[in-house]
A protein has these predicted regions:
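Conserved NTP-donor binding/palm subdomain of two-metal-ion nucleotidyltransferases/polymerases, i.e.
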Residues: 1-34, 40-266
Length: 266
């Protein structure tokens, strides 16, 4: 239905993440999917919102560049940016890396694979990252057409080469796919296991804070970790989608802390 509506409005869109990844699995139904993600052009946001609401979709959340719509129990995440924290080339020109059948777009495999690594880096930084994210990489490496040299060209543009080599080494260690870059990944592997299968659903935020502090050479303190969970600094807050209003306005940090607490407990 969504595809038909977007085509009727002549709005190009790209389906990505779970709805595409599940087709690479031997049994697509085995790849759990909490929502359907589509990318649209920013200038079509208003038209799409009006179109979906007039056709029975409820707009349940507006979160910066992401609008959530629900119909018949299915959640659709409509994005106007592919990944906010890396809104530079190549990700800011995502439509240039897709092939279209009419208005229906699909990313080139190597670009989509690169996006998954960048998306994982975002999860490591803010939410926690589960083993499922590594499994997605393994399945794509096994079944899709991945140009790893091109992947690292894309990662280099957003300064994620080291992270890419780390997660591909973990992928090799866990599932026998990927590459062994002779990196010590024991701490990363433990972190992933502590976060569980899905990461964001079973997220252990204390683990996330501990990892960051150890990476920065700080002595881990449970009390200070709890404070940092409640009151993250400005540079972290401005990267959270629902607190984008603070970007460029550091004097609003007190309001942002309060808003964040209310948002997460509403």
């Amino acid at each position: 239905e969504v595809k038909t509506l977007f085509a009727s409005a002549q709005c190009p869109y790209i389906t990505f993440k779970g709805a595409i990844l599940r087709e690479y699995y031997p049994v697509p139904e085995s790849r759990a999917m909490g929502d359907i993600d589509v990318l649209i052009k920013a200038e079509d946001k208003g038209k799409i919102k009006k179109l979906l609401i007039s056709n029975g979709f409820d707009c349940v959340k507006e979160n910066g560049p992401v609008y959530n719509y629900v119909k018949n129990g299915v959640l659709f995440e409509v994005h106007t940016k592919l990944i906010s924290c890396y809104d530079t080339e190549p990700f800011c020109s995502a439509f240039d890396y897709a092939e279209f059948d009419g208005f229906d777009g699909k990313f080139d495999d190597s670009f989509h694979f690169t996006y998954l690594i960048a998306h994982m880096a975002h999860h490591f930084k803010f939410y926690g990252a589960g083993i499922k994210l590594i499994l997605d990489l393994a399945v794509m490496l096994k079944t899709a057409n991945i140009d790893i040299q091109k992947v690292f060209e894309y990662l280099s543009a957003v300064e994620l080469e080291k992270f890419g080599k780390t997660v591909l080494t973990v992928c090799h260690n866990f599932f026998g796919e990927g590459y062994d870059y002779a990196i010590d990944t024991k701490n990363v592997e433990k972190y992933l296991c502590d976060c569980g299968a899905f990461g964001n659903e079973n997220e252990n935020k204390g683990v996330t804070v501990a990892r960051r502090e150890l990476e920065e050479g700080k002595k881990y303190s449970p009390f200070m970790a709890k404070l940092r969970l409640l009151f993250p600094p400005y540079k972290k807050l401005k990267e959270i989608d629902y607190i984008k209003f603070i970007d460029g306005r550091p004097w609003l940090i007190l309001y942002a802390w309060i808003y964040r607490i209310i948002y997460n407990f509403k």
